[in-house]
Amino acid sequence: MAGIASTVAVMGAGAWGTALAKVLADAGGEVTLWARRAEVADQINTTRYNPDYLPGALLPPSIHATADAEEALGGASTVLLGVPAQTMRANLERWAPLLPEGATLVSLAKGIELGTLMRMSQVIISVTGAEPPQVAVISGPNLASEIAECQPAATVVACSDSGRAVALQRALNSGYFRPYTNADVVGTEIGGACKNIIALACGMAVGIGLGENTAAAIITRGLAEIIRLGTALGANGATLAGLAGVGDLVATCTSPRSRNRSFGERLGRGETLQSAGKACHVVEGVTSCESVLALASSYDVEMPLTDAVHRVCHKGLSVDEAITLLLGRRTKPE
């Protein structure tokens, strides 16, 4: 892997972290995959499978799993951070003393931190003291299970340092996974953080039996919300019209493999938040709707779909009531 260390640390053995570890290995890299639970690491090393998070995907022998963060980070000049958005800070506080100086730190998480309203790249910089050019983001229409099956996919590698971006691009470029570079870190992160919320809304609509017209309206108006927020934060609108915006939004809103859409469907069918949560791994949109709405409010950006999802998830509003609320809004030009 020209331009990048032969060993890359992937911190987080969930579905997405494991899938990207496989991509890196398939592209010719040596990968150390950190798992929070020792039994997950042991299972990966002994069976080459991660049935808890990515069942059915045979992992290459060039992936070594460990539950020891010091072992995972030792000597790695590139660190992919695959933990949930709301645990990013706590994990980084533990790992910061172990991070090699000058390492490229790559966020895989899609969310806005509660309380601080920081994007993940901002959290990374805040905790580690890294310079902004050291921090990159990978985001796009990347359903982990499809990538693990080697189905063709594309993604965005966003970094203000073009050299680091190209090095990551080369490291990830396999026969089935095509990365594109982009200097717009803000737009790439906002697209990834917001699309999960819109996918929840799409799932809710499907869950109560609504059709394609409704889904198309949700996706399109959801994109308008994402663009409004992104541009208010300084994002390039073209980024949000690309893989990290429209691409990720369409995949997450339309695929039955999407956790956020599936969770929304359960809510639409009348399940409680707690009941739906038992059937799904981490669903970032449930938390992100709160932090994204607060961020939008601080910039005076209107996000009615996000507000409706927030009310359903956190304020006790029913899905039917949310639809009535949205349809009752004042009419205006598109």
Curated annotation (Swiss-Prot):
Presence of the UniProt keyword NAD in the record: yes
Reactions that this protein is recorded to catalyse: sn-glycerol 3-phosphate + NAD(+) = dihydroxyacetone phosphate + NADH + H(+); sn-glycerol 3-phosphate + NADP(+) = dihydroxyacetone phosphate + NADPH + H(+)
Transmembrane region(s): none
UniProt GO BP: carbohydrate metabolic process; glycerol-3-phosphate biosynthetic process; glycerol-3-phosphate catabolic process; glycerol-3-phosphate metabolic process; glycerophospholipid metabolic process; phospholipid biosynthetic process
SUPFAM superfamilies for the chain: 6-phosphogluconate dehydrogenase C-terminal domain-like, NAD(P)-binding Rossmann-fold domains
PROSITE patterns, sorted: NAD_G3PDH
EC number: 1.1.1.94
GO CC, any one term: cytosol
Chain sites annotated for binding sn-glycerol 3-phosphate: 110, 140, 195, 248, 258-260
Keyword hit for ATP-binding: no
InterPro entries: 6-PGluconate_DH-like_C_sf, 6PGD_dom2, G3P_DH_NAD-dep, G3P_DH_NAD-dep_C, G3P_DH_NAD-dep_N, NAD(P)-bd_dom_sf
Active site per database record: 195
Annotated metabolic or biological route of this protein: Membrane lipid metabolism; glycerophospholipid metabolism
Role noted for this protein: Catalyzes the reduction of the glycolytic intermediate dihydroxyacetone phosphate (DHAP) to sn-glycerol 3-phosphate (G3P), the key precursor for phospholipid synthesis.
Family according to the record: Belongs to the NAD-dependent glycerol-3-phosphate dehydrogenase family.
UniProt-recorded name of the protein: Glycerol-3-phosphate dehydrogenase [NAD(P)+] 2
Species annotation: Mycobacterium tuberculosis (strain ATCC 25618 / H37Rv)
Phylogenetic lineage: Bacteria, Bacillati, Actinomycetota, Actinomycetes, Mycobacteriales
